[in-house]
Structures are given as C-alpha cells and as structure tokens.
Regions:
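Non-catalytic C-terminal accessory region of glycerolipid acyltransferases
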Residues: 1-111
C-alpha cells in the first residue's frame, strides 16, 4: 500500500494541467504513472472531524474509474475527480487555504 497526497502542487516536470473544480490546476502525474506500471487499484481516503469533539470518521472509497485510462491527461483528470468526490462529502473541512491554483498555464498570479 502506498499513500499519496494527490492535491499537492508538483514541480513542472512532475505534473500536467487538469480540471479541478472548474479550474485548470497543475496536478501530479505520479499516481497515474504508478497505476500504469502496476495495474494497482486506487482508493481515496479522508478523515472528517465529527461535531462536538466526537472524534473522526475515516472514509475510504474507490477512485474515479478514469484514473485507469491509458491516456495520461485523462488519468490525471480522474485523480482530480477522485479528490473532488472526497471534498464534496465534507466541503467545509477541505483545506481551502492551500493554494492549489498558484501555478497557472499562463504563469499569471491566481492569488
């Protein structure tokens, strides 16, 4: 088992631009390349804080099926879709302060 934080912004050589919540975001290719080599199944896991100091709930779900596509861009888009699906289950708890869109295709500042 390998754990990866897939929404971290990679360097230019380690990523491609793909849709993430309607914006182009530089996205790592590592997961897609590992899947292509290993044919491993991909799961997404995240933790939600429960109200009133009730602890945490761990959720694990299968990744979007397009992550297995042979086309790198399609696979990376599937990775982003997988993250989106997790975020949508607890939007208020996603780390929105992380500057996910700081690297843009046109090199303009997003923030």
């Amino acid at each position: 088992m390998v754990g990866v934080l897939p929404d971290q912004v990679p360097n230019d050589e380690g990523g491609v631009f793909a849709n993430f919540f309607g914006q182009q975001a530089l996205t790592m290719t590592l997961v897609s390349k590992l899947v292509a080599r290993s044919q491993a199944r991909v799961f997404c896991g995240f933790v939600v804080r429960l109200p009133k100091s009730g602890g945490f709930k761990l959720t694990i779900q299968e990744a979007d099926q397009s992550i297995y596509d042979e086309d790198l861009i399609t696979s990376v888009a599937g990775l982003n879709k997988s993250v989106e699906n997790c975020v949508l289950m607890a939007v208020e708890q996603y780390q929105w302060e992380y500057k996910r869109f700081r690297r843009q295709l046109d090199r303009k500042k997003f923030y």
